[in-house]
């Protein structure tokens, strides 16, 4: 249950941001500093719960290497991965239906992995995520009638993290959430390159889905292509976990 509590806690941060934007009429919502502090507190609390749940001897599954003891790196690695993941999912919510569609493909691959290895609770958790996103997508596809805002995207980010950690294999996010990785990396690269070169850009706009949008791709094409790419990543993850000797 700690994963669900974590996702709800992250969603509350998103809700606070949306509330300030909509009700208080402050377009920027929470400041970056406020978001970072709040997210950091929630992430640390979640890591503590995971640490205690592992009997204070944290480990992580790595394909073909088995369960590897993490030691102090559990905290460093965990914080970086979780912080990056929840914000990368948030970045993906930039055009109608994109975040929901990509998260459905994420959920499908994680559901298969969990079911294949008889982790039925995690499989159910992923199934609920798929169902929720599919139901929301009815209203969120282009042209969207309903928007998830930071409340929804942060919750999805929290669930993505929770499911990966429920299988104790956060590294699998590199494949099952490859679009999240690309979106987050494109934003970091754009900002870094902009600062280093004093104004030059790698992409027309970041995150990268906006680059394709400005290159003439329709929103529907972006959603379709990104979802297919993430589904391919998910299929690769299923194969990797099957042949990589996955076991908790």
Where do the PLM segments sit?
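Membrane-interfacial loop-to-helix junctions in multi-pass inner-membrane proteins
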Residues: 1-4, 23-38
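Hydrophobic transmembrane alpha-helix segments characteristic of membrane transport
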Residues: 16-24
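Short, Lys/Arg-rich N-terminal segment immediately upstream of the first membrane anchor
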Residues: 26-29, 66-67, 215-216
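Membrane-interface helix termini and inter-helical loops of multi-pass transporters
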Residues: 22-23, 54-67, 245-248
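Alpha-helical transmembrane segments
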Residues: 1-15, 44-46, 50-53, 71-78, ...
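Internal, non-catalytic "lid/hinge" segments that mediate substrate recognition, gating
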Residues: 30, 38-57
């Amino acid at each position: 249950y700690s994963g669900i509590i974590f996702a709800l806690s992250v969603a509350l941060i998103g809700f606070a941001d949306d509330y300030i934007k909509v009700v208080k009429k402050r377009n920027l919502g929470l400041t970056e500093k406020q978001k970072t502090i709040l997210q950091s507190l929630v992430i640390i609390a979640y890591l503590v719960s995971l640490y205690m749940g592992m009997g204070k001897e944290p480990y992580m599954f790595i394909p073909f290497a088995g369960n590897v003891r993490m030691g102090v790196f559990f905290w460093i690695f965990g914080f970086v991965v979780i912080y990056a993941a929840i914000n990368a999912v948030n970045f993906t919510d930039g055009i109608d239906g994109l975040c929901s569609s990509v998260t459905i493909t994420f959920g499908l691959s994680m559901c298969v992995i969990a079911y294949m290895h008889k982790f039925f609770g995690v499989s159910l958790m992923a199934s609920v995520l798929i169902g929720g996103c599919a139901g929301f997508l009815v209203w969120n596809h282009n042209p969207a009638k309903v928007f998830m805002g930071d409340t929804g995207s942060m919750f999805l980010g929290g669930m993505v993290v929770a499911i990966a950690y429920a299988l104790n294999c956060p590294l699998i996010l590199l494949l099952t959430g490859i679009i999240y990785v690309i979106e987050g990396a494109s934003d970091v690269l754009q900002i870094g390159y902009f600062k280093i070169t004093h104004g030059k850009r790698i992409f027309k706009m970041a995150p990268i889905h906006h680059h394709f949008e400005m290159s003439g791709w329709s929103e529907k094409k972006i959603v379709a292509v990104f979802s297919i790419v993430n589904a391919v990543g998910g299929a690769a993850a299923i194969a990797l976990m099957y042949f990589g000797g996955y076991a908790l």
